[in-house]
């Protein structure tokens, strides 16, 4: 019962869309109405408000970290509990019950989850994102590369293979890549927006 309640709680935590909440609180347009129409920090940055984008990034990462940390802190369900919380908070962000199941792509939330699972894993994955984003200026490309490397880091840095948490990390990576399928098409076509680029449609 504890595992079930923790999983539901993690999903509800993930369902809080900080892109929408922060934008509304700061009097900005709903991020689902412009740019990529994705409620995430990168799209909020297209509004021109860096503060809102940073708050969105921090909020989305924090909720991912919090959901997993709480399960670990109170020892709910061991590795299975951690894995379920990780997947649940991630799915909550992707398909938030509070926002008609129209969520983001999960990059910041996944980073928060990984930081809670293992700080070094989270930092290694975040560093991968930063390096790719710095050199290529594509948030989506950075996210895709980080998603590919996250489970690899998990295996080779920590030797985690056949356990629930490792499978959860792999599942999040696959889901994140799938959520970026339109970005993949635009990257291949040379139509993807760069970081900080304002755009009213597409992306």
From Swiss-Prot:
Record's catalysed reaction(s): an acyl phosphate + sn-glycerol 3-phosphate = a 1-acyl-sn-glycero-3-phosphate + phosphate
Record Pfam families: G3P_acyltransf
Alphabetized SMART domains for the sequence: G3P_acyltransf
Molecular function as annotated in GO: acyl-phosphate glycerol-3-phosphate acyltransferase activity
Alphabetic keyword roster: Cell inner membrane, Cell membrane, Lipid biosynthesis, Lipid metabolism, Membrane, Phospholipid biosynthesis, Phospholipid metabolism, Transferase, Transmembrane, Transmembrane helix
Topological relation to the membrane, as annotated: Multi-pass membrane protein
GO BP annotations listed: phospholipid biosynthetic process
Disulfide pairings: none
Superkingdom of origin organism: Bacteria
Location, primary (coarse class): membrane
Annotated compartments: Cell inner membrane
Enzyme nomenclature, EC number: 2.3.1.275
Cellular component GO terms held in the UniProt record: plasma membrane
UniProt xrefs under InterPro entries: G3P_acylTferase_PlsY
Annotated metabolic or biological route of this protein: Lipid metabolism; phospholipid metabolism
TM stretches of this protein: 3-23, 51-71, 74-94, 116-136, 140-160, 164-178
Record family assignment: Belongs to the PlsY family.
Function text: Catalyzes the transfer of an acyl group from acyl-phosphate (acyl-PO(4)) to glycerol-3-phosphate (G3P) to form lysophosphatidic acid (LPA). This enzyme utilizes acyl-phosphate as fatty acyl donor, but not acyl-CoA or acyl-ACP.
Oligomer and partners: Probably interacts with PlsX.
Protein name: Glycerol-3-phosphate acyltransferase
């Amino acid at each position: 019962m504890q595992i079930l309640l923790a999983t539901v709680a993690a999903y509800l935590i993930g369902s809080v869309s900080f892109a929408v909440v922060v934008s509304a609180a700061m009097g900005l347009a709903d991020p689902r109405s412009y740019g990529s129409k994705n409620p995430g920090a990168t799209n909020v940055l297209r509004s021109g408000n860096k503060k809102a984008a940073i708050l969105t990034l921090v909020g989305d990462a924090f909720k991912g970290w919090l959901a997993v940390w709480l399960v670990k802190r109170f020892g709910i369900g061991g590795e299975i509990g951690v894995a379920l919380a990780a997947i649940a908070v991630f799915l909550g962000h992707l398909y938030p019950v509070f926002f008609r199941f129209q969520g983001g792509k999960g990059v910041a939330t996944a980073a928060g989850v990984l930081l809670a699972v293992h700080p070094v894993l989270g930092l290694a994955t975040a560093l991968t994102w930063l390096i790719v984003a710095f050199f290529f200026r594509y948030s989506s490309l950075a996210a895709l590369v980080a998603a590919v490397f996250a489970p690899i880091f998990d295996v080779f840095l920590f030797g985690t293979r056949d356990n629930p948490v490792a499978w959860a990390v792999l599942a999040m990576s696959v889901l994140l890549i799938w959520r970026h399928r339109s970005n993949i098409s635009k990257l291949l076509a040379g139509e993807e927006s760069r970081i900080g680029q304002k755009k009213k449609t597409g992306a």
